[in-house]
Each structure stands twice: as C-alpha cells, then as structure tokens.
Amino acid sequence: MPSYALLGATGATGSSVLRHLLYSGSSSDLTVNVLVRSKSKLLAAFPSLDKPRPSVTSSIPTIRIFEGDSTNPDVLCAVLQDASLVFMCVAQNGSPMGTTLVQNTAAALIEARRRQAQPRGELTVIQLRSASLNPVLAVQVPRFVHRVVCFCLAAGYADLRRACVLYEAAATEGLLQYVLVDPPTLHDARGTQTTGYRLIDTTDMKDKENQRQAICLSYADLGVAMCEIASRADELHGQGVGVTATGPVRQTWAVLAGFLLEGGLGHLDYRYGRENVVVLGVCILLLLGGLLYSIKA
C-alpha cells in the first residue's frame, strides 16, 4: 500500500493537492499522512475528514492527520513513517526579509530521515519552487519584469534556494530524492475548478516550443499537476519540472501585486533603511506632482 506525506495542507497549494487525492477516485489503496499546524482549520476546509471512512471498497484514501510544526524533526519522524513521497507545500504569504521557513523545514526533514531506522525506504520530496528560479523558464519573462519580481520576492526565493541546496546534498548522501515543481504566477487561491495544465520538460533543450510557459496558472491545476509529478517521480528525480496552463485561468493580480509591494518595500527597507525609502518616496511623489502641474499649466 503506497503512503504519501503532505506538509502544508491548509495552504492554497497543499489543499489543492489534498483535494485531488481525496476526490480523483484513483487512490483507494493510498494512505496520506497530513501535517498541519491547525487540525481545526484543516477540518473546516475538509469536513469529510472528520467522518468515518465509508468502506473498504471506497475510492477515498486513508487520511492520518498530524498536528505540529514542520520544522520539528520529532514530528516529521512520525509523519514520514512508511511514506515513500512527500509533497512539500509549506510556505508563507509574501516574502518577509529573513524568512527561513522552507529551508528550516528541509533541514528538519533531512534530520528526520537520518533518525529513521535502517534500512530506510526510498523517499522522494516534491518541492514547490518557482519558474523564476528555473533558468529555462525564467528567460521567457522580460528581463526587467523578472528583475523586479526577484527583487520584491528576494527573501522567499533565497529561502527556496537554500532548501534546494540542502535537498541536493541529501540526495548525494543517499537520504532522499527530489523533484522541483516550477509554476508561473499562481492565481485563484480559493478556486477548485481545474481547466487544464501541461508539464514542461526543461531538460530537452531541442524542444523550445513545448517549453513555452503561460504566465498564469490556477492553484487547482497546480495541485493536479503535482499529483501527476508524484506518479512519475522515478523518471523526474533531480529535475525542475515546469507547469503551464492549457485552459483559461481566473486571474487575481491584485493579490499578487499586494505581495510584490509588501516584499519590495521590505527589501528596500532592509537595504537602504526606512527613512531613506520614505524620503525617496516623497521625492518621487513631488516630482510626479510637479510634472502633472506643468502639463496642466
């Protein structure tokens, strides 16, 4: 009987993965160990998890809920018990300077693997990353736009990079395997309707046409894509796999703009100091005001 672990099941990505595992109808013999910080929040989003499993013949997988911190190796030892694959969907909104959540979770997971009794079964980590960190996909975005996004989300991207370095070292050590999932901008966090997606092989340098990535993808389609990647993990170990939409996406740019603005201001504050940032902002406003006044005059 296969067993998965899912970290971050109450977030937009994790809940999309869990929803597909629960309702796709192809996971009857599957056990999913779900780690969340708040069990009540998970049950509010998925009330059916609080009810008895229908029957032995049900197509719904067996769900085991663990409550705790993803950076605690003791908790992860229990969550990873018998698991052959981990969906790593732990993240936080925005990109606050100094964030280390993803790399700390990676370090705790690797420590938990070291503590597991020998012989260990093989474990594959499906780590959500970003197309901005995949050279093949990032080059498709206008350079100025890419630089602005990387500046605004610098802290979150640095956290992801460090986590990936840890996974690479752990794979070399033989502790685990990993696959990196690189979506474009993600939209419609509360949506549940899928409209279609396609995986992108970023290792085939001759097939440029099929490496093209749309700029938007829904969380719902990302969840399904991550489940497909899980089913094909053996052929994708060590790769960065792109995901692109093939259908319409309900776009929520206002939410993303808020995250970019918050991250950008935080990065400016960190590099130049809040007072200097405020002075610069006032100068820009005065300059724009002067230009508008001169145009009207």
Swiss-Prot record:
A Pfam family hit: NAD_binding_10
Sorted UniProt keywords: Membrane, Oxidoreductase, Transmembrane, Transmembrane helix
GO molecular function, one term: oxidoreductase activity, acting on the CH-NH group of donors, NAD or NADP as acceptor
Predominant localisation class: membrane
Keyword Transmembrane on entry: yes
SUPFAM superfamilies reported for this sequence: NAD(P)-binding Rossmann-fold domains (SSF51735)
Membrane topology note: Single-pass membrane protein
Biological-process GO terms, alphabetical: sterigmatocystin biosynthetic process
Transmembrane segments: 277-297
Induction line: The genes forming the sterigmatocystin biosynthesis cluster are co-regulated and induced on oatmeal porridge or the fungal isolates were grown either on oatmeal porridge or in YEC medium (0.2% yeast extract, 5.0% corn steep liquor). Expression is positively regulated by the cluster-specific transcription factor aflR that binds the palindromic sequence 5'-TCG(N5)CGA-3'found in the promoter.
Pathway: Mycotoxin biosynthesis; sterigmatocystin biosynthesis
GO terms for cellular component: membrane
Record family assignment: Belongs to the avfA family.
Function per UniProt: Averufin oxidase; part of the gene cluster that mediates the biosynthesis of sterigmatocystin (ST), a polyketide-derived furanocoumarin which is part of the most toxic and carcinogenic compounds among the known mycotoxins. The first step in the biosynthesis of sterigmatocystin is the production of hexanoate by the fatty acid synthase (FAS) units stcJ and stcK. The polyketide backbone is assembled by the non-reducing polyketide synthase stcA by condensation of the starter hexanoyl-CoA and 7 malonyl-CoA extender units followed by cyclization and release of norsolorinic acid.
Protein name: Averufin oxidase stcO
Native source species: Emericella nidulans (strain FGSC A4 / ATCC 38163 / CBS 112.46 / NRRL 194 / M139) (Aspergillus nidulans)
